[in-house]
């Protein structure tokens, strides 16, 4: 397994390495940090919108107005939500690589030592990875059924809506320690 992990890391490193000028270059560090923050704001902002605004207020919306949300607003918001998640994880991994801490952070400093900064950024990266997985492989497939984007009977729609909501709530709870870990890594160490 370790050989596969090392091989995978080498493949990722080789695929994004566009020359030695890319790694540790302040310009690219800034560009990818900026893109990471912008895409993260999009992703987590929509996550919090769904959990703190849309879901709690759906019972207050008259039935004749609910299709406006389920057929127009929710699918558009979910597009930005899932692609915000994708952009966040991709830019975060690139940022970890060009700053030289990707391997140490992703192994939580267990392989090759590391600093508290790399440990905390690694915790944040793993929480973000779990959240990204939930978005793409649990929330989105279930939302497609719940919103009628793909065919499903009423029982499956209801079960899918509940599953998507529970995993969305899980991501909301994970977002707090994820953000804390990211901020502490950048500001205390």
Where are these regions (language model features)?
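Single conserved hydrophobic/aromatic residue that forms the stacking wall/gate
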Residues: 1-7, 11-12
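Juxtamembrane boundary at the C-terminal end of a transmembrane helix
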Residues: 15-18, 181-189
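Membrane-interface interhelical loops and short amphipathic "cap" helices
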Residues: 18-34, 101-118, 189
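Functional transmembrane alpha-helices
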Residues: 27-53
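Lipid-exposed faces of alpha-helical membrane segments in multi-pass integral membrane proteins
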Residues: 35-38, 42-45, 83-90, 94, ...
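Membrane-interface helix-loop-helix modules in multi-pass inner-membrane proteins
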Residues: 50, 54, 59-61, 75-139
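Juxtamembrane inter-helical linkers in multi-pass membrane proteins
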Residues: 57-68, 146-158
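Interfacial and helix-entry/exit segments of alpha-helical transmembrane bundles
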Residues: 65-91, 156-177
